[in-house]
């Protein structure tokens, strides 16, 4: 079976008490909680495309780690059948949230602890990836102040 490739971002921020939060968005069709993700952009580095997908889908800006933190696979259901997709994931340190963004009217966004995010996502490998981040992402790397809104 052919495996399609996507790129995605795990948007993180650190609260004043050191708690790490991840921003999830809802999918457009099923309204399940997911990370911002999309198809690679021809001629654009994957980490840059992941940053742009996060801006378009979640209305966030920040600093992205250029090395992927992992992958997960999921089954994408389309009108012409299902497709197996492998998502390469990049960590995005959120520095700001936009009040208006391209997919604002199509998705919800919400902050979760990493453990809660792992509970609400449905893709098993994404659950594992989020569980793996608990305690492994050094708070010194997330030294930015949390965004003013949301």
How does the language model describe each region?
Residues 1-36:
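N-terminal strand-loop-strand
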Residues 16-18, 29-32, 41, 48, ...:
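Short, charged/polar surface micro-motifs in flexible loops or helix N-caps
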Residues 29-33, 94, 98-150:
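Nudix hydrolase/Nudix homology domain
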Residues 71-100, 110:
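Active-site-adjacent beta-strand/loop module that shapes the phosphate/pyrophosphate-binding cleft
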């Amino acid at each position: 079976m052919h495996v399609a490739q996507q790129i995605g971002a795990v948007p993180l921020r650190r609260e004043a008490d050191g708690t790490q939060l991840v921003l999830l968005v809802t999918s457009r069709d099923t309204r399940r909680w997911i990370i911002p993700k999309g198809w690679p952009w021809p001629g654009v580095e994957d980490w840059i495309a992941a940053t742009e997908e996060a801006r378009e889908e979640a209305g966030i800006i920040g600093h992205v780690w250029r090395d992927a933190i992992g992958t997960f696979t999921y089954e994408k259901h389309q009108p012409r059948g299902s497709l197996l997709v492998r998502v390469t994931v990049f960590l995005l340190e959120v520095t700001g949230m936009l009040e208006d963004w391209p997919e604002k009217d199509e998705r919800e966004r919400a902050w979760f602890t990493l453990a809660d995010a792992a509970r609400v996502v449905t893709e098993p490998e994404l659950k594992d990836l989020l569980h793996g981040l608990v305690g492994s992402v050094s708070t010194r790397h997330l030294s930015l102040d949390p965004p003013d809104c949301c």
